[in-house]
Amino acid sequence: MNRKTLFTALLLLLGRNVCSAGEPGPTIRFAEIPAGWFYMGSGGPGADYDETPIHKVVISRPFRMSVTEITNAQYEAFDPSHRALRGKQGFSSGDNEAVIFVDWHQADAFCRWLSEKEGRTYRLPTEAEWEYACRAGSCMHYSFGDRLPKAALKNQEEHHSFIPVDLTVAQSAPNAFGLYDMHGNVEEWCYDWYGPYFRGDQTDPVGYADGFYKVTRGGSHSTPVEYLRSANRMAMIPEDKHFLTGFRIIEAPYPATKPVPASTAAEPVAQHVAHWVDMNDQPRYYTPIEYVIPPQISTAPMYPHNHCPAVTWCRNGDLLAVWFSTISEFGREMAIWHSRLRCGADSWDEASLLCKVPDRNMTGSSLRCDPDSGRIYLLNGVEAGGWWRNLALLAQTSDDNGATWSRPQIVSPEHTPGHQVIAGMIRSSEGWL
């Protein structure tokens, strides 16, 4: 047997195919992922409720996945300007470290650039393709069992300040499909819009037709190890980018599966304009009215620690309150809930979930109703992970008294101190909030 034949036989035996893409430039190596099926999700207690229900998924066609996350050198063959971000906050300065500070649109653009260059179809993996490739035939918490090997751990805890770690790819053993760093190193963007799972067998699912957040998977450095599980779901505003997230790619046609229709549900809210009565200047005193009223039925858990409220009025005469609900003020489970005191009512509605970037701390909310337009503004912090120190700032608006809300926009994109808002938003004479 000559050397070439022996090399080819070894590749087939290992179930992977090493090839080159994006020449000239750093080689991207791919592994062959066979068609098959698996059980997606987990039992999902508590904060992991979005991993339920467990459901059977068929991946009907084989595909090829990059054996590592895309590196700085590989990404910068497409976007040389990214080199200025190497070493930001102390992370990822080397050619062979995973690229970070890349948003979903940039990751998607890299795939389209490479596709055009090579005459093949490269794209981000769907969430189902990602979990199937990560599990590689396993059914435990991780592809290696219920614990990760020590070599795969990179500062698996959270801190209020940045603690740099080496993000060089492929420094620990691959999974059974030959893929490195599927648990940790950096989070990885997926193709899908984030949304709840549903029951029933599925074939080649592609997620939702629209949404607020794009799925990320795999967890990262500087993250508690439970967020690195095969089933763990995370997501981000697609324009967000930070030191925890990068991506890997697959070579495969875009799935023909139809996406799940996006939810168009709106809260039933009166849309009349209230007539406000002048009550003169006499002070009035009322006993407090409880506004944190847990719902009897909810698709998301409400936690015991409810704090940091903000309240505003609505043009229809309602009062609207928001606050965070969490187990720990440093926790990634933190979510923004809200309630309404309807015009003329003497008790608040049951609370309901308003805003949740999956697996991100969301400390700090502020509300304001513009007296001229009736538009309601919500400003809220969003962390890269846990804690509440390095927040970016997102904004949403409502033009129908809080019945529906706009897509979140990042208005202060840097995850840095100084972006924790609290109640008391004002408008300056120049119109600034």
Regions found by a protein language model. Give the residues of each.
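Short, structured beta-strand segments at or near domain termini in extracellular proteins/domains
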Residues: 243-256
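Positively charged n-region of N-terminal signal peptides that target proteins for export
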Residues: 1-4
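Short proline/glycine-enriched turn/loop segments at secondary-structure junctions
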Residues: 204-208, 234-241, 299
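Sec-dependent N-terminal signal peptides
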Residues: 6-14
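A short glycine-rich, aromatic-capped structural motif
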Residues: 24-85, 105, 184
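Asp-box/BNR beta-propeller blade signature and adjacent active/binding-site loops
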Residues: 260-433
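Boundary at the C-terminal end of the N-terminal hydrophobic targeting segment
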Residues: 19-22
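Functional-site microenvironments in short loops/helix caps that host divalent-cation chemistry
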Residues: 32-33, 39-47, 84-231
